[in-house]
C-alpha cells in the first residue's frame, strides 16, 4: 500500500477506482500481502516445517480460503459452518483442525465423518462424547487436549484466555489426569497439546512464557505427542 501523486494505491490499483467500481464501504484484501505473510511465517519455521493452519474465524471469505488452499496451508475451524467452507475451498481434510468451545454432538459427528486431522477438546465430557461417536463409527480419532498454561498475554482483560482464572483450558493437574486416563483408549489418540492465550498480543514474551509452561508439562508427563 502506498501513495502516488496524492492517491492511495493497493497493489498498484487506486483506492479511488475501487470505490467507483464497487461503491463504499468496501473490503479490499491484498493477495500480495497475504502471500508474503505466509512465506515469512514459513521461512521463520522452516527448521521444523510445521503444518500452518489458517484461522477461518479470522476471515472466512472463500477467495481468501481458496488462496490458502492453493498455498498448501491447513485450516483451524471452530464450527461446522467454517469446516464446510474450508472443505469447499478444497482444503484437505487431513489438514483441518477443529478447535473451540461449545461444539455440538452434530458438529463432532460431522467432523469425524469427514476424517479431519484433529479435534482439539476442551473438557473430559467432550472426550467422552467423541469416544461414543468413534465407537459407533469404528474409528480411532486424533484429539488434542487444551491446556491452560497460566500465562499473562498482556492483552485486554476480556480477551485473555491463558491465565488460570480464565475459563478456558485445563489446569496442569486435570490435563495430566486426562492424559493418563485416555492414553490407551481404543477410540481416541491423544496427538496434541492445544493452547491459546489470547488475541492482539504485541510482544513475543507471552509466547515465550507459554512455551516454557508447555515444555515443562510435557516433560512432567513423559508423554510423546
Task: Enumerate the language-model features and the residues they cover.
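Short acidic/polar capping segments at secondary-structure boundaries
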Residues: 102-103, 124-126, 148-152, 198-200
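Active-site loop/helix belt of alpha/beta enzymes
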Residues: 150-225
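Short glycine-rich loop/turn motifs that provide flexible caps or phosphate-binding loops at active sites
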Residues: 73-75, 99, 143, 161, ...
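A charged N-terminal "starter" segment
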Residues: 1-141, 180, 185-189, 222-223
